[in-house]
Amino acid sequence: VLPFRGRTLDCAGVGFSVGLMFGNGGEGDRYVGGSGFDWAGFRDDPFGVNVDFRLRAFDETPVAPSDVSALARFEFMEGLSGSQHADILNGDDRDATAIALSGAYGSVLSDDYMDMVDGLRAFINELADPLTSLGEVTSFGAGNIILGGNGSDLIAGNGGDDLIDGDMWLNVRISVRENNDGTGAEIASFNSMVPMIPLMLNGTYN
């Protein structure tokens, strides 16, 4: 996963799944999700980020040039994970009805994809089960999931029934497997695409 600045990262065309996008909160960045429960993560930001999911990537009303208009913008993003520094993290105002209609097929985190992130199912059950009293939770789409990471963060869920933890954070590693279809033993693991690029160019990994 490459950090990006001033670009659009788009998961809208990858189907109904879970999109994991990592950036640095740079000016002009656009995080565009789609169907499925999509995450914006900022684990590598060196200073701390100011993120507001209410700043839409496709806002019909243009914002006049200002500090606000330079911030990263988001569309159909449900999960947010901060950096190891002091962050300001704001969720959006969507509720269960809006999230179910986000993207072509809705953006509810379904049972099939809950285990794509280790520990996510346990976290959701720990926070959501006391609210629902329905036993194990097999889906979540009532609001955002916001994880602060290290640092003294300011977190606001805003609309919806959000799940918030100030210490947890989302991490992603790229696993290189024995077979081209992703099966088999793990050969190597990388924290980002950057160290993989020369190994792919020289044919070490295809």
Where are the model-predicted features located?
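Acidic, glycine-rich low-complexity segments
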Residues: V1-N206
